[in-house]
């Protein structure tokens, strides 16, 4: 009897996994505007090498809808140095200044208003990938509070020394910017994170103090 129960559970587990599908991120072509710099950081992830993508984010089909579009409201911590807020949701991932939102140096954030609470499965952010630079203090959060004072869920944080002064030392790794951006799962205990607002932080990069954002996409239902 035990064998039958174990077999049934194993079959159910396999069946459940088989029902999941990968979230499809539309990637821009690789782009390099300079020789990648040697970057020394104890918090930098092992280099995957050009062209090698991260493992797919697997979710149930109902959570694969892209929730962001050109009508998504975008706000920022400070007025843009160059570019427009809507650049980060217009679908154009061209890695140059014509599609780039640039915020001043220091800790800055870009916030998306999805219009209503959604069940969020993943967030992906693209910064400037020009010389495979590394952006500092990359943090992604979800909340129903537009001021992010209450009910905040952090799905990614590589600010390992709390230099952003948000009060938490992150455990995620820094990474080189490439054409696949940084996709992050918002599934916690196999359940999506509920929220209306998505906020993405950064604190300049290894190439310059300015914070460059190409695109931010949110998926879920």
Set out the residue ranges of the language-model regions.
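Activation corresponds to long, low-complexity, non-globular regions
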Residues: 19-56
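A short glycine/threonine-centered beta-strand motif
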Residues: 114-116, 143
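Positively charged n-region of N-terminal signal peptides that target proteins for export
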Residues: 1-4
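Intrinsic-disorder/low-complexity, polar/charged segments enriched in Ser/Thr/Lys/Arg/Asp/Glu/Gln
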Residues: 107-111, 122
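A short beta-strand element within beta-rich, extracytoplasmic domains
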Residues: 119-130, 200
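Hydrophobic h-region of N-terminal signal peptides that target proteins for export
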Residues: 9-17
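Trp- and acidic/polar-enriched beta-sheet ligand-binding modules for extracellular glycan
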Residues: 19-30, 103-108, 130-221
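Predominantly extracellular/luminal regions of secreted and cell-surface proteins
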Residues: 48-92
């Amino acid at each position: 009897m035990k064998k039958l129960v174990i077999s049934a559970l194993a079959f159910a587990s396999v069946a459940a996994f088989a029902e999941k599908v990968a979230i499809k991120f539309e990637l821009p072509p690789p782009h390099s505007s300079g020789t990648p710099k040697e970057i020394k950081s104890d918090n930098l992830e092992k280099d995957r090498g050009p062209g090698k993508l991260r493992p797919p984010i697997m979710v149930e089909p109902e959570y694969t809808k892209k929730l962001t579009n050109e009508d998504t409201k975008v706000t920022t911590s400070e007025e843009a140095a160059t570019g427009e807020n809507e650049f980060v949701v217009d679908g154009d991932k061209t890695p140059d200044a014509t599609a780039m939102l640039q915020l001043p140096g220091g800790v800055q954030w870009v916030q998306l208003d999805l219009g209503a609470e959604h069940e969020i499965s993943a967030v992906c952010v693209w910064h400037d990938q020009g010389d495979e630079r590394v952006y500092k203090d990359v943090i992604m959060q979800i909340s129903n509070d537009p001021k992010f004072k209450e009910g905040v869920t952090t799905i990614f944080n590589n600010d390992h020394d709390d230099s952003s002064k948000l009060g938490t030392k992150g455990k995620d790794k820094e990474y080189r910017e490439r054409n696949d951006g940084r996709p992050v799962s918002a599934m916690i205990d196999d359940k999506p994170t509920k929220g209306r607002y998505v906020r993405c932080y950064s604190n300049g990069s290894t190439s310059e103090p300015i914070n460059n954002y190409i695109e931010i996409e949110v998926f879920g239902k």
